[in-house]
Amino acid sequence: MAEVATAEKPVTDGIQDGSEQPDRSLRFEAELEFVQSLANPQYLSYLAHNKYLESPEFLNYLSYLEYWREPKYARFLVYPNCLHVLKLLQYATFRKEISRPDFAKQLMDEFYYAWIKPSEAGVFGDDDTLEGLKREDSQAPPGQNVKMENKDGDGDVQMA
């Protein structure tokens, strides 16, 4: 597994000249792998439970990863819904909610539904949901800030 670079410990594997510059391809691969891991609600829940989503340094790193939205980088993404999650992680309300197992499952169900019926699904993280998070960010107690609606009648949960 690839070693992840930090400010204190850059990755130098694969550098032929022995310099302290991180190997760009290794960094690219590590950041690609990490940003795509954000498409996994169970991993998001893990991050929340282990307080990573409360760390200013980690939140700053998430902001840095916004460059993946640029087409020259986004073309490498296999799981483009990770970009929706990257946007949602900007909101404290979402960061609090994702620690709840039912909310993580709801997000997983939403991703699954969008995958099997892309033309019918309201993708979690759409403009209405984001506007709701902006208004309610840090103002509502956990569990009371995202409305759920069953739109298709077969038990799949959709965001209202």
Curated annotation (Swiss-Prot):
One of its GO terms (cellular component) is core mediator complex. Gene3D superfamilies: Mediator of RNA polymerase II, submodule Med31 (Soh1) (1.10.10.1340). InterPro entries: Med31_sf, Mediator_Med31. Residues 1-21, 127-160 are annotated as: Disordered. GO terms for biological process: regulation of transcription by RNA polymerase II. GO terms for molecular function: transcription coregulator activity. Keywords: Activator, Nucleus, Transcription, Transcription regulation. The keyword Transcription regulation applies. The keyword Nucleus applies. It is found in: Nucleus. Component of the Mediator complex. Belongs to the Mediator complex subunit 31 family. Component of the Mediator complex, a coactivator involved in the regulated transcription of nearly all RNA polymerase II-dependent genes. Mediator functions as a bridge to convey information from gene-specific regulatory proteins to the basal RNA polymerase II transcription machinery. Mediator is recruited to promoters by direct interactions with regulatory proteins and serves as a scaffold for the assembly of a functional preinitiation complex with RNA polymerase II and the general transcription factors. This is Mediator of RNA polymerase II transcription subunit 31. It comes from Yarrowia lipolytica (strain CLIB 122 / E 150) (Yeast). The gene is SOH1.
